[in-house]
Amino acid sequence: MGITVLKNEGLDFHARISTPLSEIDDDIQKELLDLTKKVKIAGFRAGKVPVSIVKKKYGTSVRNDIIERKINHSVNHVIKEHNLNIIGRPKIEELQNESDKALEFTVKIELLPKITIPDFKKISLDRPKLEVNSKDVEEQLEKLAALTKNYTKESKAKIKAGDQVTIDAIGYIKEKAFKDGKLNDFKVIIGSNALIPGFEKQLIGSKTGSEIDVNVTFPENYHAKDLAGKDARFVVQIKAVHTAEPTVIDDEFAKKFQSNSLEELRTHFTKQIENESEEAINTIMKMNLFDKLEKLLDFDVPESLLEQEKNILKSGTDKNEQDESLLKDKSSKEITAYYNKLALRRVRIGLLLAEYAKSKNLQLEPDDLRKVIMQQARNFPGQENMIFDFYKNNPRAIEGLKGPALEDKAVQYIFNHEIKLKEKKYTKEELEKYLEAEEQRITLI
């Protein structure tokens, strides 16, 4: 076998490989002889089929199989001999395999970069810490009480905030009834903001049996595009008004929610608030870590990974209105530059974390995958069981989560064992403002 290196620079390795025809022919002959002992052909006893007959029937497929095996063997030999750290499948080009010539082909191999892991101990980050107070917990209890109110008492008085109102309504745009603009026996709590902004407020002061006009403007980001931003008039009939019986928040109330006492329910809400904030805090900290890593990493990345990441970004932006709006006023040149920079950041950090996980021998456990699946499910409120079933029945989809799961595990290891974390305490209100500002800053990263 002859090997001529054509290119060995950066992350590209190209070589021309040739194998003498005699080697190919010898292997073909051995394969055909072996087949004479196995194949069954009408008119011949088992194991007594002449080589010429076997060659006539199977010669082409045997030759193709031998050539494919020879190519794979040769490529693997080159990879071992040159100690190549490859990514993806080698590309075979300019193949010459005519029967009267040697087997020759060019192999193009893409390489993984050599990655130097930075000294994480030189990196420091703020770690927001939520201090849950009694006011935060009481707000959650009040919300729960509001959700479980019993609207049993019918009222003849004027509608006020907090009342449950049953209505029929027909919507008109430019005096023409529009599709899906009709409500029948619809129950709404005044002040819940369940309807279009301004709708509920205009019901206040009316009574059961009255008919009123409600004038509203659909929000610009309304889910029905044909209604977004348009003025509408609803003819509303007030069919019934009910007031809620006062809800007493005590131990008996807590028992309705699998708690033995009100104090136990308060403890539950304290932990829930902490857990909900923890996920958001981790996401922000992860992005802040990546910001610092982006400035430290400068190695080349495989072109195939870069293109793959750019395609993922573009396809994700097409489906995300918020992301799309950030780029709508940009020129094609600016958009391309943006995708190039963002894709490079993601690929570099992904490769670094994979190398770091390998260096620390971090292995995925079932719990790691469960956490990632839970995160995916939380993106689809009300459809969690469907998401769980999807991953349960699709092993390939699970495979696709292993990369992100290992990345998360590496990041958590870095937080716990490497970088310096400076704890900074926030109230719930302060933390919400901080997280909102940070989320706007890292949009699309």
UniProtKB/Swiss-Prot annotation:
Record keywords: Cell cycle, Cell division, Chaperone, Cytoplasm, Isomerase, Rotamase
Organism: Rickettsia massiliae (strain Mtu5)
Name of this protein: Trigger factor
Catalytic activity: [protein]-peptidylproline (omega=180) = [protein]-peptidylproline (omega=0)
Domains as described in the record: Consists of 3 domains; the N-terminus binds the ribosome, the middle domain has PPIase activity, while the C-terminus has intrinsic chaperone activity on its own.
Keyword Chaperone appears in the UniProt entry: yes
EC number: 5.2.1.8
Coiled coil location: none
Assigned protein family: Belongs to the FKBP-type PPIase family. Tig subfamily.
Record's function text: Involved in protein export. Acts as a chaperone by maintaining the newly synthesized protein in an open conformation. Functions as a peptidyl-prolyl cis-trans isomerase.
GO molecular function: peptidyl-prolyl cis-trans isomerase activity; protein folding chaperone; ribosome binding
Principal EC category: isomerase
One Pfam match: Trigger_C
Domain PPIase FKBP-type: 162-247
GO terms under biological process: 'de novo' cotranslational protein folding; cell division; chaperone-mediated protein folding; protein transport; protein unfolding
Subcellular location: Cytoplasm
The organism's taxonomic lineage, starting at the top: Bacteria, Pseudomonadati, Pseudomonadota, Alphaproteobacteria, Rickettsiales
GO cellular component: cytoplasm
Cytoplasm among keywords: yes
Gene that produces this protein: tig
